[in-house]
Amino acid sequence: MTKNYMDRQVLAVLKINLQHQFGWNEIQYGHLVFAFQTAYALGMLVVGRFIDRLGTRVGYAVTIGFWSLASIAHGFMNSLGGFLVARFALGFGESGVFPASLKAVAEWFPKKERALATGIFNAGTNVGAALTPLLVPFIFARWGWRGCFFAVGALGFIGLALWLWLYRPPEQHAQCSTEELQHIRSDVTESSGKFSVGEILRHRQTWAFVSGKFLIDPIWWFYLFWMPDFLERRHGLSLRQIGLPILVIYVLADFGSVGGGWLSSFLLHRGKTVNLARKTALLVCAICVVPIIFASRVSSVWAAVLLVGLAAAAHQGFSTNLLTLPSDMFPARVVASVAGLGGAAGAVGGMLIAEVVAHILQWTGSYTIPFLIAGSAYLLALAVMQLLVPKLEAVRIAIPPTA
């Protein structure tokens, strides 16, 4: 998770430098974000089934290798068209990250522990987002912008080796005892057989998850791809100066990721229902996002950083509980497919926000409207999810009869 976010954020950190290098305007930069999101959405439509069929270990390994090569490819590009191709490839490769991660959580943890486990792995995204603006300025000073893409991309192959060395499903892991395996399977109600995407789409639970992802994921993409620019444009920080504020934002986001998972897991251990535990955590996080509407109006850079950091923490807490819903409501064998559909919806939302933010900045030069959108998205998402699924319940996927 950490490496995945490092790859996608290098472009955001180098945004102003690359705009000076190639003469890109805000709309052209928005097209680069749009290309990534388009490929991410398309990948999500197929990668979940790919990982469900190939298995978590091998499926994730393939995606790591693919996106690392795509990240390195940025360093060879000399035009907007070349960068569009590289961003598209990176987005397609990285679309496998969350479906594979959620499937791994479903394989290794019982339902009561999944939100906290999801929060911990989701915290890795914030580590990557925080490290990138600290590392990239030093690489840039020594080897230029191409060296930034080469160096960060090459790290992926270290992650690939570690993944293949360390990960096994619990049934195949030498250190997983019979008692631990029974604990993992303590709340499994599993059926076997083939399934279709059409069968998954018949359920309101699917659409609740998809709607939530469509509405909140674009806000995270906005933070990821435009916060360095916001700090440079609104508060006059240099490439070297943005590192510490970005670090603070994503450290706070880490606390939110783990804290959001802890809150719902705590409520479950206190005997609350899955429905009450997850939705309580979602509501608390949605409320905590609202103050970000003032981020563009404060004159102090650190006041703005704290407002964005609170919103980022709340987003991650919300996202942690949202990402747990597929494993709460669906059999483990379809979790990656459901997660893929949600990820595709989130990426489509990201495509829209890329063009909206780019045009707003080109026309107004102000972040006021994007922050207003960010502050309202989570309460809207929770309201839509509540309308679709007033009570979270497990889904049984029908299996076609066999001859």
What are the language-model segments listed below?
Residues 23, 55, 76-82, 93, ...:
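Helix-breaking motifs and short loop linkers at transmembrane-helix boundaries and internal kinks
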Residues 86-126:
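Cytoplasmic helix-loop-helix junction between adjacent transmembrane helices
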Residues 121-174:
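Helix-loop-helix hairpin linking two adjacent transmembrane segments in secondary transporters
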Residues 11-12, 204-260, 314-327, 350, ...:
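Extracytoplasmic gate region of multi-pass secondary transporters
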Residues 9, 37-45, 129-130, 250-254, ...:
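Residue-level signature of mid-helix packing/kink "hotspots" within the transmembrane helices
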Residues 58-72, 276-293:
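Structural signature of the two symmetry-related core transmembrane helices
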Residues 1-26, 223-228:
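Extracytoplasmic
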Residues 42-81:
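Conserved MFS/SLC helix-loop-helix module at the cytosolic interface between two early adjacent transmembrane helices
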